[in-house]
Amino acid sequence: MKLGQMYDAHRDQYWPGLMFGKQVPPEAVEITDNQHISREIVHHDTLEEKFNKLNIDPELKAILILKIQISHVTRTIDDYIGHGKYIRSVPDSAREIRISFVLKIDTKYETIVVDNVINLVPSDPNIQHKCPNSTHFIAGIQWGVIGILMLKSKVNELNDEASIRAALKAKLAALKINPGSKKKNDDSSYPKISNKDLNIEFELFIAKEFYELSDQPKNVDEAVEFMQKLPSLVAKVSNGKGTEISYRMLHLNACRKYLSLNNPANLSFYPIADEFMIGEIVKVFDELDQSERELNDIRCDFKGRL
């Protein structure tokens, strides 16, 4: 994606056309070195918690919910990558317990200086024909990497949900992921429930550019070591910037007075989401997802008794 690229929030569609007709000149771009590392634990694997821990904006929440609903029919999980795939990832069974460690490394932030770009490059008067129904344009890009390590296990005769959840939390806490450290992880404080009883599995979510720079992990400890390498791997991607991990979308209504358009009526100038309403929809979606998993468990149990 590029600064100035047009976006239709109703369809989650990026248009190839640029707000200002051509690439934003360097003089109109401000680059900030904002290196920062943050760590989060997602305890219950709900959409609501994932959205909150990844700081997803309300409008984007609405778009993602719509895409997830449509994907039940038209797309598979393999169509998603990185933390987008993580958000979409849901278990088939209510008996599967998941806890995730989210590592976010910010490197640089690029943003359009609107006053400068307006003076240097006039907006494209025909943009509404090239990018119909656009609602936003990309005004800022955050670079870096988001890596997510998920541990999961299923409730069985030997371990109930509470004991498994406690064991997975302790396992993640014991891993002590510290990016940049060369020390091996000390597993002496791992929970005493055996991996055989727990049958702990892992899944790693990260942009494909980083997978190509290192061997893919085969177990939890290798996944942790991979996460520890992320700062050094970021330095090898896009001249140290990493990948695009988030965008700041500027609504067209915010800069309407600057636009030189032949027919501004073809563009959507008003926000599409109410934060409270979207929050309630996310909760309902989580409840429906949980009910679907419980129903699937009942169906599987019934088939197993036939």
Give the ranges of each region predicted by the language model.
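Membrane-permeabilization and membrane-interfacing ectodomains
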Residues: 1-305
